[in-house]
Amino acid sequence: MSGNILVLGGSQFVGPAFIRLLQSKKYSVSVLNRGSKPVEGTTQLIADRNDKAAMQQHAGTHYDAVIDLSCYNAPQAQIAWETFSEDADRWVYLSTIAVYEDTPLPTEEAGIESAAYWGGYGKGKAAADAYVLGQSGPPLVILRPPYLYGPENHIDRERFVWRHALAGKPIAIPGDGTALVQFLHIEDLATALFLAMTTENLTYNVFNVAGKEQMT
């Protein structure tokens, strides 16, 4: 199977891992971002996604799927949707578990108000989720991963722990040390994005994607 895919974002961490998977399966990939870090083997579209006029200069091309990896708030979601949804056969939006309100035990009914400790990031992503879920158009799939790790991570997360461990420095534990978190390897997220893009007749359109293991 092959097709024409548009990736919004795509220049850091998640994008390159997902694009490599698409290229291995012979998809034609266009990448839309500010163009500061071109992705080899793709068609580069340059626009600031906050600029509706700049985005709409790239409208009108049919895509088998639009994969939105770089949306952080409702205005960005709206500009992208209004620009590309009419020409897309499917829309995959990368969200985050940070959209969930603080609950003792997660449930299918958990709201997307975002816990206070996520600050503006969680609130912005929750608003973007609410926007795309309220639209009619191509089939929509939303993935909500937890903390990501793996090669080319630009966030100083696992490297911080390894540096301290190798140097024999103490590693601070947030809070009282009882909080449980889950992680997801970047290649597993790339696979999940691909399945969200290609799987037909899904029963649900919002999925939490995480590793099985919980840790403090």
What residues fall within each predicted segment?
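SDR active-site strand-loop-helix element
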Residues: 8, 32, 69, 94-96, ...
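N-terminal Rossmann-fold cofactor-binding loop
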Residues: 32-36, 48-49
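NAD(P)-cofactor binding segment of oxidoreductase domains
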Residues: 61-112, 116, 123-131
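Alpha-helical substrate-binding/gating segment
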Residues: 162-172, 179-214
